[in-house]
Each structure stands twice: as structure tokens, then as C-alpha cells.
Regions:
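Active-site donor-nucleotide binding/catalytic segment of nucleotide-sugar enzymes
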Residues: 1-52
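Short amphipathic alpha-helical segments
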Residues: 22-23, 56-58, 93-96, 112-113
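Leloir-type glycosyltransferase catalytic cores
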Residues: 1, 118-165
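Short amphipathic alpha-helical segments and helix-helix/interface helices
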Residues: 29-37, 89, 112, 155, ...
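Donor nucleotide-activated moiety binding/catalytic core segment of transferases
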Residues: 50-88
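Active-site-proximal loop->helix
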Residues: 109-120
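A donor-sugar binding/catalytic signature common to diverse glycosyltransferases
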Residues: 73-111
């Protein structure tokens, strides 16, 4: 899938229908998209439900892909990733991409709390604070050496298991 723009912010809404969410939660995504759009940002919008497409598909600088895209590729090429969940934000943060969680659930996971505390990820449900964050936060340089080392260790262990069969 070719996106209609090279520079973009990825937005994924909250899963407001999930059982782990607070009751009667109101999504911040409409306000967030309106503000980002008014500031001239290109937005890759990844809806959870078909009804999510109705409002955002009308904007010129909002692209809703017709089919699923590879999440890690999206994170890597995004200027920032804003999501109403945690996994997507964690993946982006690990790649050095400015990552925002506006999760509306009852409790943040310990891993999210740690990443927020360490400055890898930002948490807010205030669209103004989120926009301030992405306007000032730049991509972090990330060393992939440790990842490569772990990958090689796993491969070596798998080879040893296979050889002993």
C-alpha cells in the first residue's frame, strides 16, 4: 500500500467498546484529528470499527487505508504514533519514534508506567498536551545492537535444540 504522503502522524483510536475500558468513555480522537488537521499534519488513521471511518474519511490530509498495514513498518515511518492503546505506542517507542498513549482503560500496565517514567512514551488524554508533546519531541537514536545480540542467542539456542532431536 502506497500512502498519499511521506511525512505523517499515525493515529489509532481507543477501543471504547472493550470490557476493560471505563464506562461511558468519550473518545478524544475527533478533537485530536481536528487539531492535527488544522495544524497541517498528514494523518494515517487506523480505525478499529467501520463506524470510525465516517468522520475522518472526509478530510483531505487524513488517509484511512483500505486494508491492514504492517504495524512495525507504520511505527518506523511515522513522525509520531498516537494511540488509545498500549502495544502500538510501546512498539513505536522502542523504535525511537515519539509515542503517545491516550489509553482510557482503568489502569496502565506496569510496562507503560515504566516507559512513561523513563521518557520513552508520553501519556495524556488532553489533546492540547499531546500536540505540544509531538511538536517538541524528536525521534530518538536507538541502538539495535542488543536486539541483534538477543536474536543471535535465540537462534543459537534453537539450533542446539534442533541438533539434539
Amino acid at each position: 500500500n502506497k500512502l498519499p504522503f511521506d511525512n505523517f502522524i499515525t493515529v489509532r483510536p481507543e477501543n471504547i467498546y472493550a470490557s476493560y475500558m471505563k464506562k461511558n468513555i468519550k473518545s478524544i480522537v475527533p478533537e485530536l484529528i481536528d487539531r492535527l488537521s488544522a495544524l497541517g499534519y498528514n494523518i494515517l488513521y487506523l480505525p478499529r470499527y467501520k463506524i470510525d471511518n465516517l468522520y475522518f474519511s472526509q478530510k483531505n490530509n487524513v488517509y484511512v487505508p483500505p486494508q491492514p498495514l504492517n504495524g512495525l513498518d507504520i511505527c518506523y515511518y511515522s513522525t509520531a504514533v498516537l494511540t488509545g492503546a498500549g502495544t502500538f505506542a510501546r512498539e513505536a517507542a522502542c523504535l525511537g519514534v515519539p509515542a503517545v498513549s491516550f489509553y482510557a482503560g482503568k489502569t496502565l500496565l506496569a510496562v507503560d508506567k515504566k516507559m512513561i517514567k523513563d521518557g520513552w512514551m508520553f501519556f495524556s488524554r488532553d489533546s492540547e498536551k499531546i500536540i505540544d508533546y509531538i511538536q517538541t519531541k524528536k525521534r530518538r537514536n536507538v541502538s539495535l545492537e542488543r536486539s541483534k545480540q538477543v536474536k543471535n542467542e535465540v537462534i543459537d539456542k534453537l539450533k542446539a535444540v534442533i541438533e539434539n532431536l
